Amino acid sequence: MSCKSNTLAKNYTNHPLRINEIHLPWKPTIPNTHYEFVRAQVVDLLNELGLCEDKKERDRRDGVIMLASYMYPEAGPQELLFGTMYVLWLFFFDDIFDESKFLKEECNQAAERSLHIFRTGKAPEKNAKLNFSIVQLEDLLLRIFAMANDLAKSSDITARFMKSCEIYFVDGAVPMENFRQMKTLPKLEEYLAVRTIDGGAAACIACFEIVAHLDLSDDIVNEPRVLRMCEIAGQQIAYANDIYSYHREKLHNNSMNSLNIRCQTLSFEDALTEQIAQLNGWVQEFETLKQSLAESALWENSLKMYITGMENIVMGCKVWSESCTRYNLKSLLTVVV
């Protein structure tokens, strides 16, 4: 999952996944200038916690650190450290289910204990039978919440962040795991509703409020147009990721992908055409909503920064996905130079 820090997304042609047809109108993000500092801090922390001890896990760690650097390109050093730790936790927690690292009862235990932390900010009591990996992830999560309290403009912002973690877990990670256990693929609309949340975009946007030291009111964050833009960011990341990860998931015999669901009634090329059109349509809707807000009485610098944060998270995921070795897209395409 490692990425070269100086590699940006390129324009590709004749790619079997047609990624050059996914159009985003925003400026590509570049790695945060504090990347090296944050990487050193994260490596020390994970070593202290006993995480990422084998090469595969270290490669994954380095890849996620770079991803966060693309997602939060203008964050200060401590703010980027906080955002990076949270994105790492999302990947670690997803791997509990996705790669079946724990027994079923251990997965349930990790889930229940994490939910307790989301709701209280405190870890439940430990016992001798607790899997050490669960303890490690809890320690990481508690450090993340401690940083959130230190960096957030107000306790309301911290509470909103913790609530987004709970929603990610309850409405995203757990239902997605239930889908993986099914013998048949879910309906496309059911999959999208869960995948949008499981992709973690809304949680990363809530994290951005802390990273950027914003202090938006609930009325602004919950304004229907703003909510829809946040949802679009999640949909765009989820469906684009399903395209980027398609061949990797085939190699791992993972059929839980929107393209596979579409292919139940469409050819692969038609499924890809439909999905790319939907992605580009969502971006057009996002831009229309942004223009509507810019012309409204709600428009002010903090809201503009909030929306720019959404754009950076989406664009950062695109740039990283097209340049990282996790999906190894370069091996499947002809590069335009």
Swiss-Prot record:
> Where is the motif D(D/E)XX(D/E) motif annotated in this sequence?
94-98
Q: Which UniProt keywords apply?
A: Lyase, Magnesium, Metal-binding
Say yes or no: keyword Kinase present. no
Q: Give residue numbers for sequence motif WxxxxxRY motif.
A: 320-327
Tell me the residue numbers annotated for binding Mg(2+) 1. 94, 98
Keyword Metal-binding (UniProt): yes
Lineage, top-rank taxon, reads: Eukaryota
What family, per the record?
Answer: Belongs to the terpene synthase family.
Q: What protein name applies here? A: Terpene synthase 4
